[in-house]
Every structure is written in structure tokens, then in C-alpha cells.
Regions:
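Short alpha-helical scaffolding segments that buttress acidic/His motifs in well-ordered protein cores
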Residues: 102, 115-119, 158-161, 165
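Hydrophobic alpha-helical connector segments
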Residues: 68, 79-112, 151-154
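Phosphate/oxyanion-binding loops and surfaces in catalytic or ligand/nucleic-acid-binding neighborhoods
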Residues: 72, 76, 105, 109, ...
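Amphipathic alpha-helical segments used for helix-helix packing
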Residues: 104-132, 173-175
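C-terminal peripheral helix-coil segments that are non-catalytic and often amphipathic
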Residues: 1-7, 104, 136-147, 167-208
Length: 208
């Protein structure tokens, strides 16, 4: 006897761009609800009403899907930090707001566990889309400054924030507990350090 498909599984003709967009949205939902292990081609296909083979065609592999998701999350972070330099210069509360945006992306947004999953898989080539997104983030922030030394300082600031937010998302709760520190201890520390990167003499240049 014919059994009618459920509405969310109904298949329709979609462009490649639409499939990727819907697939990444579904992957993000799976990441937040069930963790990195749930971000598979089969689960995404089920969520968007496509076969495993069709999803495979658009993302190449489960690792490719996870990498594309990570890259899209970094691009979203770039958009969220669109006017960061001006804010930092005019708003005393901006450093903490910037820290919260970055840390939220790695923690509540799931980027921290996903990055750890990709790295521990050993397939580091899957970080290439992330590399492009991170460089775009640096360029977006550098583009807001007229200081010749801004590129070096921005790269250093992004390095500091990204590594700190990643570590805080993965192991931060346990380390904070060992040291009797509040939940926002690392965010507060980064917020206090971050303004130094806007001052030409705030951070000594790296040794040659």
C-alpha cells in the first residue's frame, strides 16, 4: 500500500546553491542539537528531503560537509564583526561585546566542538574553507583601519581571540572549575586585552 511521504521529506528540484544553503542550515541544526558526530550526509539528506547520493554530490564527503559548515560559521562571525574597529574606538563596552560574539560562535554556536572534531579526525586539509574565511575576517577588520601596522595587529588579535575562544569552548569549563573562576573569566580577560591591539604602541612587534 502506498504511504505518503512526510511533508519535510518531499523532494523538489533545487539549484546547487539552494542545496548547499539548505544543507548547511540543516547541518548547523544537527550540530547544535546533537553534536559534531550527527553532522553526516545521511542526516542532512533526511532533514532536507534529499538522498544520501545527492547530498554527497554537493559536499563531496561528510568531512567536506563539516568543513563547509565551519567555513560558513566563520563567515557569519565576519558579518557580526562588521564595524568592530569603529565600535572599539567609540564604545567603552565594545571590547566585551566583541569578545562575547567570538566566544558565543565557538561555544553556543558549536564552532569549538566542530573544529575539534575536524582536527582530531586528522584530515586537516578539510580546514581549507576555514582558512579562506579566517583570512576574509582579517581583511574585513583591516579594511576599517588606515594604520599601516594594522594587518599585523589584527592577525595577532584574531589569533588570540580564536585560540582563546576555541580552548574555552572545549576545555574552559573544566579549567575554570579547577581555578575557581567564573564562567565569563576568559571573556573578561580578552575584553581587557583587546583594546591594546588598536593602539600602535599597545602590543610590541614580534621579534624578527
Amino acid at each position: 500500500m502506498y504511504k505518503q511521504a512526510r511533508p519535510h521529506q518531499k523532494r523538489r528540484k533545487r539549484s546547487g546553491a539552494e542545496v548547499r544553503e539548505e544543507g548547511l542550515a540543516a547541518a548547523r541544526g544537527l550540530l547544535l542539537d546533537r553534536g559534531p558526530a550527527a553532522v553526516t550526509l545521511a542526516n542532512v539528506g533526511q532533514a532536507i528531503g534529499m538522498s544520501h547520493a545527492n547530498v554527497l554530490h554537493h559536499f563531496g564527503s561528510a568531512a567536506g560537509l563539516q568543513s563547509a559548515l565551519m567555513g560558513s560559521m566563520v563567515r557569519d562571525l565576519t558579518d557580526a564583526l562588521g564595524n568592530v574597529v569603529e565600535l572599539m574606538k567609540t564604545d567603552a563596552a565594545a571590547p566585551r561585546a566583541v569578545a562575547d560574539r567570538v566566544f558565543d560562535a565557538f561555544d553556543k554556536g558549536g564552532a569549538g566542538p566542530l573544529a575539534a572534531w575536524i582536527i582530531l579526525s586528522g584530515d586537516v586539509e578539510q580546514l581549507d574553507p576555514v582558512r579562506a574565511a579566517v583570512r576574509a575576517l582579517v581583511e574585513a577588520i583591516v579594511g576599517q583601519s588606515t594604520d599601516e601596522a594594522a594587518p599585523d595587529r589584527v592577525r595577532a588579535a584574531v589569533l588570540m581571540m580564536a585560540v582563546s575562544a576555541f580552548g574555552d569552548a572545549v576545555i574552559g569549563p573544566h579549567v575554570r572549575d579547577m581555578l575557581d573562576q567564573p564562567d565569563d573569566a576568559m571573556r573578561d580577560l580578552i575584553a581587557r586585552i583587546l583594546p591594546l591591539f588598536l593602539i600602535p604602541t599597545g602590543i610590541p612587534p614580534a621579534a624578527p
